[in-house]
């Protein structure tokens, strides 16, 4: 239950007392019902009743990391949305993408962004990249009850590590399971229903020391391959001009490719596959 406010208009002690730098920990005391996974759910499975986001890929580069996601959300055998955005900046130097229950994933992403901003404002410094991954892991763990009823959210987190001694290894990738376990991945990773096909494509084409531009094209190709075999993953939609969301994190910060830039890459990939469908 949310903290009761004083009729005089003063904030409750909870809002003014010295506490944790974690916004989600504060929210768990002030209004726990607002946290994902804390709401009571009826018995049964809800897998086919809500839109689900699908495939996200991450690739480490010589100067950072690239994160990309397709735009399709499905509900059972239906396409629920064709232009959903699953990849977002977590803060100035990190990115997060969500696969799974779309509504919970969007809520979890926003909460994670606030969590990192709240920490930076209260502590006067940014969390380390490992610290960010651990905070996200705790949030995913908090959704375990809903995950057991078919409303799982599986994030993919990537960022530029400002504390890295070797700039060539500053791009780091973390995957998670539904219980909140964080796992650092080497080189590349993918999550979602098309991840098996995306990772197969990445496995064949990935090499150490990729430039950001090469990694961006590789990410789009991996999503194309995933869409080719997985009905829940959307490929480049040339008719509606809907293309993957592609972002990078480097020493200069996070950057999202413009619609025109992504369109040019996607159309080039599609043209190449018309000549060689297998890539």
Swiss-Prot record:
Which Pfam family is one of those matched by this entry?
A: Proteasome
The keyword Protease belongs to this UniProt entry's keyword annotation: yes
Signal peptide positions on this chain: none
Q: Which residues form the propeptide?
A: 1-53
Annotated pathway = Protein degradation; proteasomal Pup-dependent pathway
The GO cellular component terms are: cytoplasm; proteasome core complex, beta-subunit complex
Where found? Cytoplasm
Print the keywords alphabetically.
Answer: Autocatalytic cleavage, Cytoplasm, Hydrolase, Protease, Proteasome, Threonine protease, Zymogen
Q: What is its EC number?
A: 3.4.25.1
Catalytic residues, chain numbering: 54
| Record function comment | Component of the proteasome core, a large protease complex with broad specificity involved in protein degradation.
Give the record's subunit note. The 20S proteasome core is composed of 14 alpha and 14 beta subunits that assemble into four stacked heptameric rings, resulting in a barrel-shaped structure. The two inner rings, each composed of seven catalytic beta subunits, are sandwiched by two outer rings, each composed of seven alpha subunits. The catalytic chamber with the active sites is on the inside of the barrel. Has a gated structure, the ends of the cylinder being occluded by the N-termini of the alpha-subunits. Is capped by the proteasome-associated ATPase, ARC.
Family to which this protein belongs? Belongs to the peptidase T1B family.
Protein name, per record: Proteasome subunit beta 2
Q: Write down the species.
A: Salinispora tropica (strain ATCC BAA-916 / DSM 44818 / JCM 13857 / NBRC 105044 / CNB-440)
Gene that produces this protein: prcB2
């Amino acid at each position: 239950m949310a903290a009761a406010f004083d009729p005089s208009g003063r904030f409750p002690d909870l809002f003014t007392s010295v506490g944790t730098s974690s916004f989600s920990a504060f929210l768990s005391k002030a209004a726990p019902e607002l946290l994902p996974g804390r709401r009571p759910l009826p018995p049964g499975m809800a897998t086919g009743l809500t839109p689900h986001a699908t495939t996200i890929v991450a690739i480490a580069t010589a100067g950072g990391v690239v994160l990309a996601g397709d735009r399709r959300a499905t509900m059972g055998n239906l396409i629920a949305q064709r232009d959903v955005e699953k990849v977002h900046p977590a803060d100035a130097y990190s990115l997060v993408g969500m696969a799974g229950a779309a509504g919970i994933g969007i809520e979890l992403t926003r909460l994670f962004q606030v969590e990192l901003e709240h920490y930076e404002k209260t502590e006067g410094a940014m969390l380390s990249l490992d610290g960010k991954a651990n905070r996200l892991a705790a949030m995913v763990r908090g959704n375990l009850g809903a995950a057991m009823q078919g409303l799982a959210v599986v994030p993919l987190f990537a960022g530029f590590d400002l504390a890295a001694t070797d700039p060539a290894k500053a791009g780091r990738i973390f995957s998670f399971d539904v219980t909140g376990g964080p796992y650092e991945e080497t080189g590349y990773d993918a999550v979602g229903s098309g991840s098996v096909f995306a990772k197969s494509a990445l496995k064949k084409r990935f090499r150490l020391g990729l430039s950001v531009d090469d990694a961006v094209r590789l990410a789009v190709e991996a999503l194309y391959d995933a869409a080719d075999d997985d009905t829940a993953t959307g490929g480049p939609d040339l008719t509606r001009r809907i293309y993957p969301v592609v972002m990078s994190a480097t020493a200069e910060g996070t950057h999202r490719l413009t619609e025109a830039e992504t369109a040019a890459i996607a159309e080039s990939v599609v043209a190449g596959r018309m000549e060689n469908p297998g890539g």
